[in-house]
């Protein structure tokens, strides 16, 4: 049945239509013919002494009733020409696409027979739509079903947000009737108004009621939920409230991303696995409809996210980004989420940044996220050390991936500007982990990777560890040793400067020559220390040069030994060839001599 009202259908008959029975006057006893109903198989029968004369089919259920009680209250039935039944006496009527189905029509049938009517939030919306379908207006009887259901919705349902939620849920299968009758709009407006006005309630009351209201709103179907959120935004609800409801809805209806991932390989990462594998083909074949529903839900939720920062957590944004990638959301939506994450990156953690890796460009999302952060916080990045710490921890995690190319690791390591790091200990730890996981890197790649690290920003403990780290290139080790010596020198100088004022105060009454001699001794000591540092530097440089020459000598020796081996094989082969030729000649000579002796013996025997 389309959404055309029963009144319009009545007018469409015109003068050429069937004769209406609205002028018939029914005795009061006619409408009290039925005391109850009974069901046999898939049919409902009215218990009455008068035989039924009307068969009404709703879906696959047939109702046996009397024509007059229905005509007296239903304008639609009174306006159409009833067709005689072919199987039995009376008339037959089939109601197509009846709102609420057979259960709702059973309630209406009881109402037409003046049996008690039980209106409640569960059945009032279907009854309101069905009464509109049958055109049960005041024109046919005062207090008809349209007015009763409308009054119940207005004065009972809309007075309670719990009843309003119940009615709104019952409207899911009543489209387009519930929309045209403004039932959905009124319910959504009431819920949005209630959610917005909870801000003015004291906090102790909000804690009890707010959670229930928000949780119940987050259980609606996606269409009605979007209507409520859109109305809340139009009423200028607080972004934190809107974001809280959206996050709750995602928890209820979107799957946890790990449930859709298979073949996880952690490579010793414990709980923070990096290597995700999504069996997309199997997922789409087994539940293609469910995947499409999840994709539409994601796109709907992202479209109504409040633009204000802090409305939703960075953890939630990264979760939505992961889910969007898994369910192949639109590139524009993924880009929007990346921008949102970039603006809230300071609140993220390493586990949130571990995005499913099933594409060829698995690191591009992380790179763009950091780029968006730098664009948004370009002036404030110095005051946010949490970002450099986050990147250090993230690099340490992805460095454990044996399939991660060095170029992608280096791009991420160079994302933040140099002044964003106060200390490079975390970066050193990540580089060391990468070198440990990728032992086959060439010396050139090792030097290139270590250039991203500033040795001057390493702590003393990190320098001492790096000085004994054989995974680092030799040049980096020399630089770190130099840095260690320089740091020790600076520390000693600072200690001397701290002690100098104390000594001056103690000996303030001493002679001027003693002060000068003490200063000269300090200067002499510092010069000796500086000479020692220079000497150690020259020793390290000479050691480095010797090692470099030894390496080159060994490399050239290996090449020369390899060439000598080839030449020796050639000489050996030539000697072997000559020897084989000599042996061949010797056999030929022996055979020829043997043949001559045989022929001589034959000649002697013949003679």
From Swiss-Prot:
Residues passing through the membrane, by range: none
Chain segments carrying region Disordered: 498-520, 573-607
Basic and acidic residues composition bias: residue spans: 499-520, 577-586
Coiled coil start-end: 511-563
Tissue: Expressed in emerging leaf primordia.
PROSITE patterns per record: BTB, NPH3
Superkingdom of origin organism: Eukaryota
Residues modified as Phosphotyrosine: 428
Domain NPH3: 211-487
InterPro entries linked: BTB/POZ_dom, NPH3/RPT2-like, NPH3_dom, SKP1/BTB/POZ_sf
Domain BTB, residue spans: 52-121
GO annotation, biological process: cotyledon vascular tissue pattern formation; leaf vascular tissue pattern formation; phloem or xylem histogenesis; primary root development; protein ubiquitination; shoot system development
Pathway assigned to this chain's UniProt record: Protein modification; protein ubiquitination
Family of the protein in this entry: Belongs to the NPH3 family.
Written domain comment of the UniProt record: The BTB/POZ domain mediates the interaction with some component of ubiquitin ligase complexes.
Name of the molecule in the record: BTB/POZ domain-containing protein DOT3
Species whose genome carries this gene: Arabidopsis thaliana
């Amino acid at each position: 049945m389309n959404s055309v009202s029963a009144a319009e259908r009545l007018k469409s008959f015109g003068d050429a239509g069937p004769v209406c029975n609205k002028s018939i006057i029914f005795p009061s006893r006619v409408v009290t013919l039925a005391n109850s109903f009974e069901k046999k198989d898939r049919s409902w029968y009215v218990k009455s002494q008068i035989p039924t004369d009307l068969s009404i089919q709703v879906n696959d259920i047939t109702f046996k009733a009397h024509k007059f009680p229905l005509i007296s209250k239903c304008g639609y039935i009174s306006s159409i020409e009833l067709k005689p039944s072919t199987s039995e006496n009376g008339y037959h009527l089939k109601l197509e696409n009846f709102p609420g189905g057979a259960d709702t029509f059973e309630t209406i049938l009881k109402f037409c027979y003046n049996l008690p009517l039980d209106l409640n939030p569960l059945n009032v919306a279907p009854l309101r739509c069905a009464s509109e379908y049958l055109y049960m207006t005041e024109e046919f009887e005062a207090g008809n079903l349209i007015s009763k259901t409308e009054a119940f919705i207005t004065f009972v349902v809309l007075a309670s947000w719990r009843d309003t939620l119940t009615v709104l849920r019952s409207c899911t299968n009543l489209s387009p009737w519930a929309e045209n009758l403004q039932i959905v709009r009124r319910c959504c407006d009431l819920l949005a108004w209630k959610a917005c006005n909870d801000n003015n309630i004291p906090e102790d009351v909000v804690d009890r009621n707010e959670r229930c209201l928000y949780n119940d709103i987050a259980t609606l179907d996606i269409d009605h939920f979007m209507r409520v959120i859109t109305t809340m935004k139009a009423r200028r609800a607080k972004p934190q409230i809107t974001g809280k409801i959206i996050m709750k809805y995602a928890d209820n209806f979107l799957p946890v991303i790990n449930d859709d991932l298979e073949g996880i390989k952690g490579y010793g990462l414990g709980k923070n696995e990096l290597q995700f594998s999504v069996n997309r083909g199997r997922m789409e074949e087994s539940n293609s409809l469910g995947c499409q529903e999840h994709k539409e839900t994601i796109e709907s939720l992202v479209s109504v996210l409040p633009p204000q920062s802090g409305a939703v957590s960075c953890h939630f944004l990264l979760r939505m980004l992961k889910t969007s990638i898994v369910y192949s959301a639109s590139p524009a939506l993924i880009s929007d989420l990346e921008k949102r994450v970039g603006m809230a990156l300071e609140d993220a953690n390493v586990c949130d940044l571990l995005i499913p890796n099933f594409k060829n460009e698995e690191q591009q999302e992380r790179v763009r996220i950091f780029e968006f952060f730098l664009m948004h916080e370009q002036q404030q990045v110095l005051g946010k050390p949490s970002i450099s710490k986050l990147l250090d921890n993230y690099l340490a995690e992805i460095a454990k991936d044996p399939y991660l190319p060095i170029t992608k690791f280096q791009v991420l390591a160079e994302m933040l500007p140099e002044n964003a790091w106060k200390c490079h200990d975390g970066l050193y730890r990540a580089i060391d982990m990468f070198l440990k996981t990728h032992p086959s890197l060439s010396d050139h790649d090792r030097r290139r990777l270590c250039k991203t690290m500033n040795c001057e920003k390493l702590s003393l403990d990190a320098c001492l560890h790096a000085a004994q780290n054989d995974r680092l290139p030799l040049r980096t080790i020399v630089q770190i040793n130099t840095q260690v010596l320089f740091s020790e020198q600076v520390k000693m100088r600072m200690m001397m400067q701290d002690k100098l004022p104390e000594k001056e105060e103690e000996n303030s009454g001493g002679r001027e020559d003693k002060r000068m001699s003490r200063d000269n001794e300090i200067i002499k000591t510092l010069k000796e220390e500086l000479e020692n540092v220079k000497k150690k530097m020259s020793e390290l440089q000479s050691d480095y040069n010797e090692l470099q020459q030894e390496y080159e000598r060994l490399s050239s020796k290996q090449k020369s030994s390899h060439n000598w081996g080839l030449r020796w094989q050639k000489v050996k082969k030539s000697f072997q060839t000559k020897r084989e030729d000599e042996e061949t000649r010797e056999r030929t000579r022996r055979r020829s001599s043997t043949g001559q002796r045989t022929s001589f013996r034959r000649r002697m025997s013949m003679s």
